[in-house]
Every structure is written in C-alpha cells, then in structure tokens.
Regions:
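Short alpha-helical transmembrane segments in multi-pass integral membrane proteins
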Residues: 1-20, 80-147, 193-248, 304-368, ...
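Transmembrane helical elements of multi-pass membrane transporters/channels
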Residues: 18-37, 141, 175, 208-212, ...
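Small-residue-rich hydrophobic transmembrane alpha-helices
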Residues: 52-112, 149-168, 278-342, 372-386, ...
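N-terminal transmembrane alpha-helices
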Residues: 7-39, 43-47, 60-75, 79, ...
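Transmembrane alpha-helix boundary and packing residues in multipass membrane permease domains
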Residues: 23, 27, 39, 78, ...
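Helix-terminus/linker motif at the lipid-water interface of multi-pass membrane proteins
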Residues: 28, 32-53, 122-129, 185-196, ...
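Short runs within selected transmembrane alpha-helices of multi-pass transporters and secretion channels
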Residues: 73, 142-160, 168-176, 201-216, ...
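Small-residue hotspots at the loop-to-helix junctions and early N-terminal turns
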Residues: 49-60, 135, 139, 202, ...
Length: 455
C-alpha cells in the first residue's frame, strides 16, 4: 500500500501499531544515550561519584537542546502531515525547508551557549570544583557539536510525517550503536585511544548523534518524494514559521519545562548531593519509560492530523481511542519493570552512596507513570487538532505550577529533619493525577468543538 493511501485507508489501530512501534523504539533508543553514558561513567575507576553528579547537573541543558529540536519537529510533523492530507505538495516543500532553516538558527544559539555560558550554569548548582570541571567539559562538547541532535530531530519528524517512521528508527539505532561502542573506548581508554573520562562520554554521544543525523538526511532526500527538496525552500517564510510554532511551541515549552523542572529540583535537592544524584539517575530511567509514551504520541499526532485534514470524523475518533489504550498498556508495563527491578538499575549505574535514595525515588515516582503517559497522549491529540493552548496548560501544570511548589514545600519538612527525602518524591504522582483530571476535561471540550462538528 502506498504511503499516502496508508494514511488514508489503513485501519487506524493497525496503522498506529505500524507507525508507533518504530517511533517507540526510536524514542527509547534516544533515552539510551543518557542511560549508557551514566552507566559507563558510574563504573569509572576514579571520580565516578563526582562524574555522576556532573552528568545530573548538565542533563537539563541536554534536555533543553532536545526540546527545541523535537518541538520544532513536532510542529513540522503535524503541519506537514496536514498539508499533505490536503494535497498541497508545494506548501509541504516550504514547510520542510523552513524547518531546516530553523535548525540552523537553533544550532547557532547552542554553539554560543557552549562557548560562553556553560561554566556559569554549572556553578549555579554546585560548589564542588571536581564536579564543576567535569560538568563544564561534558556540556561544552555537547553544545558545540549539537548540530547532530538538532538535525536528527528534524529529519526524524519529516520522515514520520510521511509515514516512514521505520527509517527514522534505523537512523536512531545506528546512532545508539555507535554511542555504545565508543563509550568504553573513549571513557576508559582502549587501544590507541587515551582515557578521557567524562569527555569521552560526551564525544561518544555527539558522534552517535551526528551519525544518526547524516543517515536520516540521506533517507529524507531519497524517500520523501511527496514534495520537492532544495535550498530555495529554506528561504524563511514568516507565515509557515508561525504555523510551525503555533503547533510546535507548546511541545517546545513542554520539553523545556521538563528541563526547568529538573534544574529546579537539583536546586531543591542541593542540600543532599546523594539525593540530587539519585534523582538525576532516576530521571534517566523515567525518561526511558515516558519516551515510550512520547514515541506513541508521535504516531498519534500525524495520524489524527492527517484525518483532520481529510475531515474524517471516524478516523479521528479511532486515533484518540487507540492512542489512549496503547499508551495505558505501555505505561503499565513500565510501572511493572521499575517497581520490580529497582535494585538492578541501581547496580547498573553503580550508584554508591546514592543507591538507597535512587531505589526510594523509583518506588514512589514510578506510580505516576500511568497518569503521565495519559497526559502525554492527551497532548499529542491536542496538537493534532490545533489545541496548542490546552497542551501548554497541561505542560505548565505538570512541570511548573503544581510540581515545583509542592516539592519545595515538602523539602522544608525534609530539611528540618521531620521526615525522609521520600516525601519530596510524592510530589510527582500527586501532580500527574491532578493534571490528568484537567486533561480529561480539555479532551471532552476539544472533541465537542473540533470532532463532533464534522460529518
């Protein structure tokens, strides 16, 4: 079945599985980058505790770079899918070209921050000179060579928008394999390579990202034949850029709020470096689980957006139904794994002094995965149906308005010695439940205003 016919005619439940599995694998592999780095760094012969703390502190900026790249890609994905659904190949070419122009701008900003801003950023979270030095070295490399992750994110969404998610997964697998192979070689110094420690982890990561980006660029040029390619389509078009970010900005803010949340949580936990490190390690495991929901969301959005462009009420309704069902199944699986094997993850990271804090965080925060996954699915549905404001509100509730004040208040009791650090972890499930209830109200309203009116 041709790609365009597949988006129009294949049963939505089968289409979502066919598109969703490669996207889920792609997102899971994206989370592997950070897990693998931490696992190898945690097993360094010397300085592993400081190195793990350093990776925890740099993680918010890594997330922010990914946020801007993926968010721009999400906007491109939905707009491109809708434009192709309307049969407008000329505009589709401009949408793709403008997304690449935006990628260049994003890289320049990351490059400047990598040169001038990383030391001040790391210094705000620690006074330990060893942690500071490691954090600056790692983050500077990731920022200066960030073009790999930025353009990978864009080409991934361009392929997904045309139903070719399998090829984006192939690119992700190649990058992950390159990263995993290079990590021990560059971190520990194997063969002719000198021992580089955390710098080696950074170089392994960015080389893997560049490999993925190059491969997806080739796939994009060779396979996306529904619209033309060329530098002329990169000429900035204010209207198209506005349309991209009308959809993508909420996704950027959602991802950026995750970065802000982790940064502020690092500040809240600054009184206990072991708990701070434990939270950073757990967050990488949490990302692995929630990226399953993000991957499925990236199938939900183009499927529903394409159906919305066709004005197909039934396919939109099926997209919502199966998107939520499949998300719930994935999140239950994630909860089971993290609740049953917390000790195994702690051993993988060689968590040391942070081990008990890490296991405690996993036991409590994992409860929130079900509601967090549903919230992610809601946001994918909103984005497909022009519900950018609703998506933004859910992000603000989950990452800022509820979680941070709640964790801050709970930390006061912990610092006063009235209760253990585990109280802070309970802020996460409480937040996700509240956001999920609000999200359900939004979903009912959007269905009434955008879907039920279709014939």
């Amino acid at each position: 079945m041709a790609e365009s016919n597949k988006m129009k005619e294949m049963p939505v439940n089968k289409l979502m599985v066919q598109m969703g599995i490669p996207m889920i694998l792609s997102m899971a592999l994206q989370a592997v980058y950070n897990i693998v780095d931490s696992a190898f760094v945690g097993n360094m012969k010397a300085g592993s505790e400081a190195a793990l703390n350093a990776l925890t502190l740099v993680f918010p900026v890594q997330m922010l770079m990914v946020a801007v790249g993926i968010g721009t890609g999400v906007g491109t994905n939905a707009l491109l899918a809708r434009t192709l659904g309307q049969g407008n190949s000329k505009k589709a070419a401009k949408v793709a070209g403008n997304s690449l122009f935006l990628g260049v701008i994003i890289y320049v900003v990351c490059l400047l921050f990598g040169i001038f801003g990383v030391k001040a950023y790391i210094s705000s979270q620690t006074v330990d000179t060893e942690v500071l030095e490691m954090g600056v070295s790692y983050l500077r490399i990731c920022c200066v060579i960030s073009f790999g992750i930025i353009f990978f994110s864009l080409f991934e969404k361009l392929l997904q928008a045309t139903g070719r998610s399998l090829y984006s997964t192939i690119g992700q697998v190649v990058g992950a394999v390159v990263n995993i192979i290079l990590d021990p070689i560059l971190i520990y110094g194997i063969g002719p390579c000198p021992e580089m420690g955390v710098k080696g982890a950074a170089y392994a990561t960015v080389i893997g990202q560049v490999a993925s980006a190059v491969l997806l660029f080739i796939f994009h040029i060779k396979l996306n034949k529904e619209f033309e390619h060329g530098a002329k389509y990169m000429k900035p078009d204010g209207k198209i850029i506005k349309e991209i970010y009308a959809i993508g900005l909420p996704a950027i803010i959602a991802q950026a709020l995750m970065s802000i949340m982790v940064y502020v949580m690092n500040l809240i936990l600054k009184f206990n470096p072991s708990a701070q490190t434990a939270y950073g390690l757990f967050y990488k495991v949490q990302q692995f689980v929630l990226f399953l929901a993000f991957g499925l969301r990236d199938a939900i959005t183009p499927i529903i957006a394409f159906a919305y462009g066709m004005r197909s009420k039934k396919r939109i309704q099926d997209g919502i139904k199966y998107g939520l069902i499949y998300t719930i199944v994935l999140m239950i699986l994630g909860i089971a794994i993290t609740e049953i094997f917390p000790g195994g993850f702690a051993t993988l990271f060689n968590a040391g002094a942070s081990r008990e804090y890490f296991i405690g965080a996993m036991r409590v925060i994992s409860i929130s995965f079900l509601f967090a996954g549903i919230n992610v699915a809601y946001q994918g549905i909103y984005q497909a149906l022009d519900g950018g404001v609703e998506s933004l509100v859910i992000s603000l509730l989950r990452q800022l308005i509820i979680i941070l004040p709640l964790a801050g208040v709970f930390s006061l009791f912990v610092r006063n010695g009235q209760i253990g650090v585990s109280l802070i972890w309970w802020a996460f499930p409480i937040t996700e439940v509240i956001a999920c209830l609000v999200g359900y109200v939004f979903l009912k309203r959007i269905r009434k205003n955008k879907v039920e009116v279709l014939r």
